[in-house]
Amino acid sequence: MKWLVVKIVNPRNGETLVDPCCGIADFLSLSFVNAVEKQKDWQLDDANIYGVDLDESMIMLATLNMLLNGDGEAKLYCKHTPGSILTKIAVGDTPTLVDLIPDRHKGGNWHDWPDNTKLMQFDVVLTNPPFGEDRAYRPSTEQDRRIIEMYETWSLAGNGDNIDLGVVFLENAYHVLKPEGRLGIVLSNSIASINRWQKVREWLMERMRIVALFDLPPNVFAETGVNTTLIVAYKPKSSAALKKLIEQEYSVFVRDIERIGYERRTSKRNVFFNPVYRIDETTFEVMTDKDGHPILEEDFTQTIADFRQWALGQEETLQCLFLRET
C-alpha cells in the first residue's frame, strides 16, 4: 500500500519531503528508493528528507531503515508527546525544531513569531498518522487544551472533549506544505464519510484541490482492523486558483482497492501474512512475469496506471505535479 502512495504522489529530485509521524520511515525510504530506481541522477537528495516521531525506538529503526536503503543524511527527529502536534521544523542553515506558542498561534495562525523564525514548508507530505476513537487527542490539562486550540479544526470539529488525531495531522499537513505542495495521507474512512467530520471535509475542500480518494480494506492495517482512506491532494498557489477549479467542477479520481496481494491468517494468536498469487483462469496455474516471478493478486499496479492515464486529462498544474519525471 505504501508503494501506492509513493507512486501516486511521486516525490522527485530537488523536492523536500516530510513525514510528521514517520514511525520506521517507510514512506521516506520508499520515496528515496523509488526515485533511485527511475534513474541515477533523478534521486531525491537525502538531505531534503525529514521525519519526526515521538517514540525514540521508532527513530532508531527509521535511521536503520534509511541507511539500509542508501540514505544516510535524512533528518530524523525524536520529539516526545505531544510530538509534531506542537513541534515544527524551522528554516535555517541547519534546520531546527521549534515549538508553536499557544498564545500567538491560535486557530492555525502559525506564522506570527516574535523573532525572525520561519517554519519550513515542504514540497511533499506523506504520512499515516494515528487515528480512530481510541487514539483521539483528549486534552486533560489546560496546557493540552491550549495546544489543540492552535488548530482551526479543533473549533470546527472538536466536541470540547476530543478530536481524531487524523484530523489534527491533516491540518498540520496543510500548514507545512508549500503552495503547489502535494499530500498523501492515510486516515480512518470515517473522517471521509460520517457527519461528525463534515465541517472538516468542507475546511479541506476550501483549501486544497482533492486529487484522488482510495478506499482501502481493513487488513491493510492489520493492527487496527479499521477501514481506511488514502487522500491525495495538492495546495493551489492561491484561493483564486482553487476557486476557479471549483467553478469548473474539477474531477477526482476515486478507486476501491480490494486485492492487496496477501491474506491475513491467525493461528494460536500468531498473525501470518500469506501471499496471494494471480491464477490463470485456463490452466489454473500461478501466473508469472517475464522474469518468471509469480504475480501477486493485487489492484495497485493497475490503479497506478489508471491514475496516470486519468491525470493526463486534468489541469496542467496537476499533470506537472503528479506526472512530471524530472
Per-region residue spans from a language model:
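Conserved S-adenosyl-L-methionine
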Residues: 1-116, 120, 124, 132, ...
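A conserved structural/catalytic subdomain of Rossmann-like adenosyl-cofactor enzymes
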Residues: 102-326
